């Protein structure tokens, strides 16, 4: 139960409008939270909670620029393989009398050796183990990371890897308290001890999660210690329509994204906030580094017997040409997002196709011509193709199904629970599947890694089992290129090659949509939809 201290107002040293602030920020997480351990921060719901509790060496700001966090500065040697971080001296773990006394012990560089080694250890079974793939290994298989003293950390890479600093901003790379993890074991998932602006208070799974203000947090703003909020309260209402009604009643402060159940109630066809809600709600939008797409499994041997794999490039290209993405965005998403007429790299990252030169527009005549060249005029003789999706995206996929039927391509919908779809996709068991990729770090390599032959699932994110020697050679060249502009040129060539081979169908580039009450202040946003609450405060209406 929340204590009465949550009703206290902020101290008088705050700006005047903050003095009357309510101190609890409330949001709903329909998808649930499975773990508060950074080792398992693989989805947005876990990431948002973990990000309030933990810090890493570095972090991203709203402009996607890497900033200091627990490291106050860093150096990279000339050959790009040695990263040296100089740690802050004023950071302590959350206080827990079982491990660290009333204030929490200071952090040490050796804590990072433990934290990173734990992610890379196969026994941890972290889905984020791949983030340290480029770190050199010792003869015993451990990461080549040194702590010359308590305030200096050195990380040695196998080869130059320009995206590495961005990778270190991911929650997988957060600092955990070694003695707490050792003592708690698997219970650390629900009893986390970090260094973040909020500390763990209470969690009844599926009902309520409460985080409390960390009174010893190291960051300040305008001479005042962050965060401004006293607590964060997270509910787990599964029904998104019910959660929306709670938001309208003022019982939630924030919603991200929009569900078809209330889309037309809240937004105009042009994607603006309906006039009935402008006095009550604030809508903020920006491009989202999230590419929504359909993927083909190009390796028939992995599929179950009888499944039809679309191994003919001409058929895949025909599907790409066979539906109107702009119409789909306009009518099914109220113009929230932009049509996927470019490559896999979303706009906003260097290397992206901003002019639609390498992707696919709506061209049914070209689609029919390609089908005829493939030996299936008007689709005659072409087997039915099974498209696996989830209920949330069924409207979009039914639109594509209808559009493709007009040129002779028959799709069969296979609706799965999200977890089941993810598992089948990772095991290469789906011939044609809905997917999306949200940037883990601000580098186009993150998207192009989906097509590197070394990343075949289940060991990596190449869910299509796409393989191209030319692509792999370009990938290797990009990783050796220190100049960002020249590296972006290589990325563009790689994206062009992928789109020509068409292992995917780009649907649209998403948009961050945030709905807040008019009393919320200080809630920023960035293109990967991070939730940063350390500067948030509330004012009375």
Predicted regions and their residues:
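Surface-exposed binding/hinge segments that line
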Residues: 111, 118-177, 204
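Gly/Pro-rich hinge or "lid" segments in bacterial periplasmic/extracellular proteins
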Residues: 150-151, 159-227, 231-233, 241-242, ...
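Extracellular/periplasmic solute-recognition and catalytic clefts
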Residues: 201-212, 235-302
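Detector for C-terminal structural segments
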Residues: 162, 204-208, 281-292, 318-353, ...
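Aromatic- and charge-enriched surface segment that lines or borders ligand/interaction sites
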Residues: 73-125, 154, 243-246, 309-312
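N-terminal lobe/hinge region of extracytoplasmic solute-binding protein
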Residues: 28-79, 117, 124, 193
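Structural transition elements
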Residues: 198, 313, 339-374, 393-395
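A structural "hinge/loop" feature
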Residues: 31-50, 70-71, 97-101, 162-173, ...
